[in-house]
């Protein structure tokens, strides 16, 4: 049945306006973004099929364009709408960790990094620059692609730290596989960065590895002394 034929107030857009977005299911929220379905499949049914196809919202939003657009009812326009929504969510998270904010709550840092990196289909190595009071200076994405000990250059990290006058840093990267367990290469990178930063008297507070639903902290495991 087409959504326009549903009882008044039951369509996803009407329900959102009447009750608020929190009252909508994942499929209903996605349907609001998609706006319409295709022949024989309304927007909610299309949204539900997309979520099922990719195994969840996060996997759908981080899927590459060719994987999404190959499905019936989803073209470049709908793909662009989904990507815009995902980017807005990341930017909201970025505003929550504003310049000058003191990182006294580890959960805030985890939530921020999860929103920034968990939905990427490629590896990103980034750095959170802090001042001597552990206030945020800037979050910077440094490297993209396959992250290993050969592709992360300590001198570039040191150069950025000096440029921004940071006193401490948290480095982080994601695992597109969704598994946050650090590799031996991750541990080697961390040791090289810690030693390089020590030469300019800057503390490496942590290296966080972001998976689909968890973050592994090197500091919590005692791997950064």
From Swiss-Prot:
Protein name from the UniProt record: UPF0758 protein SO_4248
GO MF, any single term: metallopeptidase activity
Q: Tell me which Pfam families the record gives.
A: RadC, UPF0758_N
Does the record bear Aminoacyl-tRNA synthetase in its keywords? no
List the source organism.
Shewanella oneidensis (strain ATCC 700550 / JCM 31522 / CIP 106686 / LMG 19005 / NCIMB 14063 / MR-1)
Do you know which PANTHER family this protein is assigned to?
DNA REPAIR PROTEIN RADC, UPF0758 PROTEIN YEES-RELATED
Q: Any keyword Cytoplasm? A: no
Family named by the database record: Belongs to the UPF0758 family.
PROSITE patterns membership: MPN, UPF0758
The record's section on InterPro entries has: MPN (IPR037518), RadC_JAB (IPR025657), RuvA_2-like (IPR010994), UPF0758 (IPR001405), UPF0758_CS (IPR020891), UPF0758_N (IPR046778)
